[in-house]
Amino acid sequence: QCEQAESRAVLEAALSKLLSIVSVHDILSRGRAGESVSCLSLLHALADNARQLLSESQHISITLCGDDIPLSPEQMPAVAIVISELVTNAIRHAFPGGRRGHISVSCMAGLRYSFIMVEDDGAGYDPHTASDGNGIVICSSTVEEKLHGTLQFRTGPAGTCAVFSMLTPAHETE
């Protein structure tokens, strides 16, 4: 039983990453080369992918709101990786035992930096006892190296909030 659950989790994580890649490719193929793309379009596609991965016993809603941040074609895959990982982590860990819940993804555009926040109303987590998975490490390094920003977490009994910053496309080369 435990092995089967682990195998299912690994397959779901792989499927989530594959769906993210497909979404990025689909959105990029509809635009012109080098043109910025809509962050909200990407987030809608990623939220749809996440909803497909929910089982019937999971009662989790996902909403999106905020500014439509323009993303460069170079930023888009990195944003997709980070958002997919954060939403997948919330789905897998924030709502144990069939607990109902909500995940919100919101965007705030800034002149130099823009921000994306993934927040859940789940159980929260203790970063000292969290699993040894490398998803958060990948998220942090992706935000720092590809988006030139930072990733921060706030967690407690009312849920978890992850916020990452990224340079706006006009400042990417700095």
PLM-predicted stretches and their roles:
Residues 1-10, 32-33:
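Short acidic helix/loop segment immediately C-terminal to the autophosphorylated histidine
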Residues 11-19, 23, 27, 36-53:
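Short beta-to-alpha transition helix within the HATPase_c
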Residues 37, 55-84, 91-101:
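Conserved short strand/loop->alpha-helix "switch" segment adjacent to the catalytic nucleotide/phosphoryl-transfer site
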Residues 100-112:
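Short beta-strand/loop element within the Bergerat-fold HATPase_c
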Residues 102, 124, 156-163:
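Glycine-rich nucleotide-binding loop
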Residues 106, 159-170:
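Short C-terminal beta-strand
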Residues 120:
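Acidic ATP/Mg2+-coordinating residue in the GHKL
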Residues 127-154:
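ATP phosphate-binding glycine-rich loop and adjacent ATP-lid/helix-beta elements
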